């Protein structure tokens, strides 16, 4: 794949993001120029983000998608940086850009969206596995994370004898030294376990094939407008679709019904 400027795409992270976008976009997978891909993406996506602000893209009137690359054959923890794990994406989230909040104003705007974590294990240019897991199968309610953040912020602000500034981070302390020229930024660095570890009981990882998993709540599956006919891949033993029960991220004493797609090729 070439950039419009004729520069090569930098690294497997970019290639993984194109791969995931193409999976949702269909026809763009046959295009090699990034400007040609962009024209297709603009027909399908209402928002295309950047590496500094979630999400990476939003399907028009559909889910948000956040792409994460792990440079290992399997497993590995996932760095989320300053954004805590999300069961849903909210337009009120201070971590997203204004352009993201306004990306569907022509349809009346949005307040809450499903979010899909697309997590790829890649070495060199080989994709070992790709998870497409809905946040509400994987992450707790936002209050679970906000409570920790607010508790830490309040604790920092109670440190006596220092000067604070307003910040979106956990805190910023000014004039730390006698000259008043040093400051300290305090920021959270969130991370989450790989879904391959979280849902390992449901997996068969014996072969060296590339594996793709899609996990969603059964209630989400029922509401999907268009379900592709995957009979051909099931008959070829490439794909299985199973109803399973997974722990409720908000209360592991309860299970929730879910649908797991497993492909190996």
Where are these regions (language model features)?
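Nucleic-acid endonuclease domains
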Residues: 1-54, 58, 63, 69-265
């Amino acid at each position: 794949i070439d950039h419009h400027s004729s520069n090569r795409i930098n690294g497997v992270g970019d290639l993984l993001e194109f791969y995931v976008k193409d999976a949702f976009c269909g026809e763009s997978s046959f295009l090699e120029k990034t400007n040609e891909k962009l024209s297709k993406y603009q027909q399908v996506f209402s928002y295309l983000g950047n590496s500094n602000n979630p999400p990476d893209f939003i399907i028009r009137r559909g889910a948000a998608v956040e792409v994460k690359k792990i440079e290992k054959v399997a497993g590995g923890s996932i760095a989320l940086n300053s954004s805590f794990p999300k069961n849903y994406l909210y337009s009120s989230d201070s971590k997203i850009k204004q352009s993201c909040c306004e990306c569907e104003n022509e349809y009346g705007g949005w307040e809450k969206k499903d979010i899909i974590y697309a997590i790829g294990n890649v070495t060199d240019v080989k994709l070992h596995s790709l998870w497409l897991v809905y946040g509400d199968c994987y992450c707790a309610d936002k209050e679970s994370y906000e409570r920790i953040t607010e508790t830490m912020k309040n604790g920092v602000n109670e440190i006596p004898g220092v000067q604070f500034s307003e910040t979106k981070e956990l805190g910023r302390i000014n004039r730390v030294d006698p000259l008043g020229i040093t400051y300290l930024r305090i920021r959270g660095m969130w991370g989450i376990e790989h879904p391959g570890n979280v849902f390992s009981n449901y997996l068969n990882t014996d072969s060296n094939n590339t594996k793709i998993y899609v996990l969603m709540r059964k209630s989400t599956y029922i509401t999907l407008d268009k379900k592709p006919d995957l009979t051909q891949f099931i008959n070829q033993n490439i794909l299985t679709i199973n109803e399973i029960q997974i722990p409720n991220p908000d209360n592991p004493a309860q299970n929730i019904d879910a649908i797991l797609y497993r492909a190996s090729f």
